[in-house]
Amino acid sequence: DRDSCVDKSRCSKYGYYQECQDCCKKAGHNGGTCMFFKCKCA
């Protein structure tokens, strides 16, 4: 699920956490970035 990483992955305010990117990749996406403390899959 595209939004499942939002709750699971904590983010810093700027840039992305590796945790977010890994979660998104496991979900089948290319990766993820963090915006406003939330993980977004891309």
UniProtKB/Swiss-Prot annotation:
Gene Ontology CC: extracellular region
Subcellular location(s) of the protein: Secreted
Gene3D superfamilies noted in UniProt: Knottin, scorpion toxin-like
Tissue specificity: Expressed by the venom gland.
InterPro entries: Ergtoxin (IPR012622), Scorpion_toxin-like_sf (IPR036574)
Primary localization: secreted
GO MF entry, a single one: potassium channel inhibitor activity
Bridged cysteine pairs (disulfide): 5-23, 11-34, 20-39, 24-41
One Pfam family from the record: Toxin_17
Keywords: Disulfide bond, Ion channel impairing toxin, Knottin, Neurotoxin, Potassium channel impairing toxin, Secreted, Toxin, Voltage-gated potassium channel impairing toxin
Coiled-coil spans in chain: none
Domain comment (free text): The presence of a 'disulfide through disulfide knot' structurally defines this protein as a knottin.
Function: Blocks in a reversible manner human and rat Kv11.1/KCNH2/ERG1 potassium channels. Also completely and irreversibly blocks rat Kv11.2/KCNH6/ERG2 and human Kv11.3/KCNH7/ERG3 channels.
Further information: Negative results: does not affect human Kv11.2/KCNH6/ERG2.
Family: Belongs to the ergtoxin family. Gamma-KTx 1 subfamily.
Protein name as annotated: Potassium channel toxin gamma-KTx 1.7
